[in-house]
C-alpha cells in the first residue's frame, strides 16, 4: 500500500508475483462477512478489504522455462528477460477472450474458488484458436481469474474505487500484464517506475515518515513528499477487452470442476519399474 501510494480511501493496489493480492481502502465496513475477503488496515488505521490468491505467476514462469529449454536446445542463447518480453508482447496480439483456451495456474489450493490442492492445467477444445498469442494471453488472464472473483464480491458490496496501482514482477514487462489486469478489473490500472519494488521500499518510506513527517498525515506525506507528480502510466481497458475477459471468466468459472477432477484423479506420485514390479513413490514438492 505504501509503496504504491495507495493509503487513501477509494484507492487500491494490486501486487502480482508468485501469489497476488488486491488491497482496497474502504469508505465503510462491509455489510456482510465474506470468507474470501480478509479485513486489514492501512498503517494509519483505514479499513482495507484484501483479496488474496495463492497462485499467480508460477505457471507462467514454468512455461517460460519450457521455451528457454527449447531455445537452448537449438543452440540459441536468449536471456529470460528477452523471453518474457517477447512472450508477453505476443499475448497482446491474442483474442480478447483468449481464443476459447482455458488454464488454471494452480500450484497450490485456491480458497476463493474452493480448490484445496493445485494441479496446473491447460485445456482446449478442437475448435479453440490455439496459437502462441492466445496461449500466452490465457496464462496472463488466468493469473488474475481468482482475484476477479474476489473483486466481484467487493463490487456486490458497492465498494467504489477511484484508482488502482499495480506492482510486482508480472509488470516488469511494460503493458501486457497491466492491460490484461485492467480488463480483469474493468478499470484503469496505473503502473509506476517503481513497479518492481515492494515491501522493503514501503517499510523504508514508513521509517522516513516516522522521522520526518512534520505533522502530515501518511496520505499527504506520500502524495506531497514522496511521489509528487509521479503519476505513472495508466492503461484504460477498451469495451472489447472488458467483454472478452468476461467471456473468459465465464469459461473460467464453469471449468473449476475440471480442476477439482484433476486433483481427485491425478495424484502426485511417480512410477518406478524395477525387476518387473511397480513401486509408487511420492514426488517431493519443488516449492
Region locations from a protein language model:
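Active-site core segments that coordinate phosphate-bearing ligands/cofactors
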Residues: 1-285
Amino acid at each position: 500500500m505504501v509503496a504504491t501510494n495507495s493509503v487513501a480511501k477509494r484507492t487500491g493496489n494490486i501486487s502480482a508475483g508468485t501469489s497476488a493480492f488486491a488491497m482496497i481502502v474502504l469508505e465503510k465496513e462491509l455489510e456482510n462477512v465474506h470468507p474470501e475477503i480478509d479485513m486489514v488496515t492501512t498503517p494509519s488505521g483505514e479499513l482495507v478489504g484484501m483479496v488474496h490468491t495463492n497462485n499467480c505467476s508460477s505457471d507462467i514462469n514454468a512455461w517460460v522455462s519450457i521455451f528457454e529449454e527449447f531455445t537452448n536446445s537449438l543452440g540459441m542463447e536468449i536471456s529470460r528477460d528477452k523471453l518474457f518480453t517477447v512472450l508477453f508482447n505476443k499475448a497482446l496480439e491474442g483474442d480478447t477472450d483468449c481464443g476459447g483456451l482455458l488454464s488454471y495456474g494452480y500450484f497450490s489450493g485456491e480458497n476463493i474458488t474452493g480448490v484445496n490442492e493445485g494441479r496446473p492445467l491447460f485445456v482446449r477444445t478442437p475448435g479453440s484458436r490455439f496459437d502462441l498469442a492466445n496461449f500466452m494471453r490465457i496464462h496472463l488472464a488466468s493469473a488474475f481469474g481468482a482475484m476477479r472473483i474476489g473483486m466481484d464480491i467487493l463490487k456486490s458490496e458497492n465498494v467504489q474505487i477511484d484508482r488502482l496501482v499495480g506492482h510486482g514482477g508480472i509488470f516488469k514487462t511494460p503493458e501486457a500484464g497491466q492491460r490484461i489486469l485492467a480488463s480483469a478489473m474493468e478499470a484503469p490500472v496505473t503502473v509506476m517506475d517503481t513497479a518492481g519494488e515492494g515491501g522493503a521500499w514501503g517499510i523504508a518510506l514508513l521509517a522516513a515518515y516516522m522521522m520526518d513527517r512534520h505533522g502530515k498525515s501518511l496520505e499527504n506525506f506520500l502524495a506531497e513528499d514522496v511521489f509528487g507528480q509521479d503519476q505513472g502510466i495508466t492503461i484504460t481497458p477498451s469495451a472489447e477487452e472488458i467483454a472478452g475477459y468476461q467471456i473468459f471468466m465465464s469459461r473460467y468459472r464453469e471449468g473449476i470442476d475440471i480442476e477439482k477432477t484433476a486433483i481427485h484423479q491425478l495424484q502426485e506420485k511417480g512410477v518406478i519399474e524395477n525387476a518387473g514390479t511397480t513401486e509408487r513413490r511420492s514426488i517431493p514438492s519443488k516449492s
